Amino acid sequence: MVDALNVGVNLEAFSQAIHCIQALRSSVTRVFDCLKDGMKNKESQEARERTFVSEFQDNLHSVNGDLNELERLSNLVGKPSENLPLHNSGLLSLDPVHDKTPLYSQLLQAYKWSNKLQFHAGLASGLLNQQSLKRSAIQMGVSTKRRPKVQPTTLALPPQYIDDVISRIDRMFPEMTIQLSRPNGSSAILLVILGKVLKVIVVMRSLFIDRTIVKGYTENVYTEDGKLDIWSKSNYQVFQKVTDHATTALLHYQLPQMPDVVVRSFMTWLRSYIKLFQAPCQRCGKFLQDGLPPTWRDFRTLESFHDSCRQ
């Protein structure tokens, strides 16, 4: 009885209600049996009718009595407590519907993200290995007087030296025109025109390439005041893709001790876009994929690939 009070249910009335339901079902069954059997064989028609009506009324009174008793017991049973502890079964409603869970799309996105992370981690590892930043206990024990001091001379190169390097690179590639300007002091900005394919704005800091912006050959690269526009992107998706690949190339071609080699290597890689709309993809052999030509160029072989085919 204590448990019944705790949950708010009268178990004795509940048990009596179950027996009452069984009695009600039996009463209803007798009513239908009476209708099924009909009038029994008697001596006269009137006697048969009186017997049938009497039995049918008795059965209906029995059904009515059982139904009233069931209603009375249902009021005594009570309602279960709303604070009934469900424990872990109360968490079943929080489970997602498997048919509506975007499991495949989430796994595919995670797989692509993992591949890109592995690719960029490999690039970062190669760059760190080129920097030669290894330190050992022997090097830490060397006296500071005997250590060779490396002067950061490459950070402040004379403008004449930078002009000579750019001029030599300009003569190396006849189909490429390089215009050098210094609108903001000593830092140089290059406007590279590659045939009739594209234009590239190269922002330099001394002899180090800071950023690049690739635009179409027919696009305007100047602002309203006549200066090179180093901020706005191209209006075409194909050249936006090439801009992203050029930024990746800047991270690949890193050699702080020889910045002129870096600039020459980058210009050699950039020159491979002279056949941007003519070279097919080396992986699938198609010229267009999703409406775009092969925008990726391999850093070593300079072969053309679609962005999705290079992985």
UniProtKB/Swiss-Prot annotation:
Gene Ontology terms, MF aspect: transcription coactivator activity
Subcellular location: Nucleus
Top-rank taxon: Eukaryota
Keyword terms: Activator, Nucleus, Transcription, Transcription regulation
Keyword Transcription regulation tagged: yes
GO CC entries: mediator complex
GO biological process: regulation of transcription by RNA polymerase II
Subunit structure: Component of the Mediator complex.
Function field: Component of the Mediator complex, a coactivator involved in the regulated transcription of nearly all RNA polymerase II-dependent genes. Mediator functions as a bridge to convey information from gene-specific regulatory proteins to the basal RNA polymerase II transcription machinery. Mediator is recruited to promoters by direct interactions with regulatory proteins and serves as a scaffold for the assembly of a functional preinitiation complex with RNA polymerase II and the general transcription factors.
Family that this chain belongs to: Belongs to the Mediator complex subunit 27 family.
PANTHER family: 34 KDA TRANSCRIPTIONAL CO-ACTIVATOR-RELATED, MEDIATOR OF RNA POLYMERASE II TRANSCRIPTION SUBUNIT 27
Name of the protein: Mediator of RNA polymerase II transcription subunit 27-B
Lineage: Eukaryota, Metazoa, Chordata, Craniata, Vertebrata
